[in-house]
A protein has these predicted regions:
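Serine-hydrolase catalytic machinery in alpha/beta-hydrolase-like enzymes
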Residues: 2-11, 15-92
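Short, hydrophobic alpha-helix immediately C-terminal to the catalytic nucleophile
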Residues: 31, 107-108
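Short glycine-rich phosphate-binding loop at a beta-alpha junction
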Residues: 94-96
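Gly/Ala-rich beta-loop-alpha elbow adjacent to hydrolase catalytic centers
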Residues: 98-103, 107
């Protein structure tokens, strides 16, 4: 079940960027990247991994080689986020993914 709700920032945007944090990050981890890039007319959405990896730290994947890996919640969250942004008026060709480390793996 998808538990995370994306945080939408800008209202007058021509493109949407979904920011995906790295291992042990959270939805706030990518805000400094958004501020540094300063992309005009971009709506930023900061999502958070569904798997706990410490105090206010999250992961996009959970498990190990012996027991197997969990990742379906992450795929579902990203898919739902893209659909929500699309429903809010952004064509899919104007929705971009920006990930750091483990978040970049999810973006691929």
């Amino acid at each position: 079940m998808v538990k995370n709700i994306p945080v939408f920032k800008d209202n007058n945007s021509k493109l949407a960027i979904i920011a995906i944090h790295g291992w042990k990050g959270n939805r706030s981890s990518m805000e400094h990247v958004a501020n540094a890039l300063n992309i005009k007319y971009a709506q930023w959405t900061f999502i958070q991994g569904p798997y706990a990896a410490g105090d206010n730290k999250y992961s996009w994947f959970e498990g190990n080689e012996e027991e197997g890996w969990k990742y379906q919640e992450s795929f579902d969250l990203l898919h739902k986020t893209i659909l929500d942004i699309n429903k809010n008026g952004f064509p899919k060709s104007k929705i971009f993914l920006l990930g750091f480390s483990q978040g970049a793996c999810l973006a691929m």
